[in-house]
Amino acid sequence: MPPGCSFLNFTASHDGIGVRPLEGWLPQHDIDALVELMHRFGGYASMRTRDDGEDAPYELNITWFDAMKGNRRGPDAWQTPRFLCSQQLMLGLRGIPAIYLHVLTGTLNDLEGVERSGRLRSINRRRWQRNELEWLLETPATPTREVFKSLTRMLDARRQEPCFHPDAPQRVLDTPPSLIALQRGPTAEGRRLIAVHNVTDRPQPLELQELAHGQWHDLLAQAPWNHEATLAPYRSLWLVSEGSG
């Protein structure tokens, strides 16, 4: 990366979720299964014509919140935790994060918008009425309120953390497939941050060599980390250490 340049990280935008980058990385049957799953979750797929004349998906048309509705077994009870895990993972990556409005509000598929416009991308371009959005944000137990409060808390913590500077080093840590973990830093002062994510719907043992020693602080809880041995489904941690390492 040239000096003065940075990655721009985001999961969703006003367009669809691109799937062409998966080509060559995932088997075609896995891509096909993903497309079918998004159909089951109320979304669509925009298609292109390949050189051989066959149709192939180039983007998924679905809100990111509804894309997190379940896994290959179908919808489940983990939609909001899964969604928040995906955002905390993105926010921890080296670079500058961007969050689309309808990610910040946990917006559902706008199927009426698709019918009105005749465009698949309208599914993720809902036009909020102010009173409707304010009601969702102010009413306890709505997904919109939970998502908005959780994401703004993450953003506040991230903004004040030196290890999240766009130029801070990043290293992906060795973990089982059920976990994704990375280290940001160390900074010039020796401060390090470990971001670890359980990307499954089952509790997972948390056994990272990098966390075995030293005192760690839970950035979001604003409290010392208690060295929990198990990470709950779709739970994420941002842990910081002041010492060198």
At which residue positions do the language-model features occur?
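Active-site and adjacent substrate-binding regions of carbohydrate-active enzymes
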Residues: M1-H213, L220-S244
